Amino acid sequence: MARLTVEECMGRTNNKFKLVILASQRAHDLNSGACPVIKHKNGKNTVIALKEIAAKQLDVSSLFNLSVQRCRKYMEKFINSDEQCVTNKSKIDIFQQNAITSSFNELGNNSNNQGSNLLGRDNFFSTPENRNTSNTDS
């Protein structure tokens, strides 16, 4: 059934890829609530779209323009969200850099901090047992 419909549709356009785009747009319209132009018996929207194109009940150029507009909207949304992600990422990087810098400054200034004692001593690579004995020696 669909093979005959595709062969009939090739009379409207000589490009199979364009036919797929046209049928996809019409099926999208039908799924969104558009009324079918031809009568059908419980067919799927993709088959109905192909039958409408084959029956020359649709303006192929306007259908193609709708598909291009839908693609443009999607791409604009995608590009805008990508730019927003890059902007947010740069803001996050700045905040993370400030947090890291302030954390290192706090470690160096706080002598009661265990991390500051560890970083300030020569026994950085020693075992925990050796660190405990060297802390009591000081």
Curated annotation (Swiss-Prot):
Enzyme class of the recorded protein, top EC level: transferase
Reaction catalysed by this enzyme: RNA(n) + a ribonucleoside 5'-triphosphate = RNA(n+1) + diphosphate
Keyword Ubl conjugation applies: no
Domain of life from the UniProt record: Bacteria
Entry keywords, A to Z: DNA-directed RNA polymerase, Nucleotidyltransferase, Transcription, Transferase
Entry keyword Glycoprotein: no
Comp. bias intervals (Polar residues): 124-138
UniProt EC number: 2.7.7.6
GO terms of biological process kind: DNA-templated transcription
Annotated region described as Disordered, given as residue ranges: 117-138
A cellular component annotation (GO) from this entry: DNA-directed RNA polymerase complex
Sequence similarity: Belongs to the RNA polymerase subunit omega family.
Job description of the protein: Promotes RNA polymerase assembly. Latches the N- and C-terminal regions of the beta' subunit thereby facilitating its interaction with the beta and alpha subunits.
Subunit structure: The RNAP catalytic core consists of 2 alpha, 1 beta, 1 beta' and 1 omega subunit. When a sigma factor is associated with the core the holoenzyme is formed, which can initiate transcription.
Protein name, UniProt field: DNA-directed RNA polymerase subunit omega
Naturally occurring in which organism (per UniProt): Ehrlichia canis (strain Jake)
Gene behind this protein: rpoZ
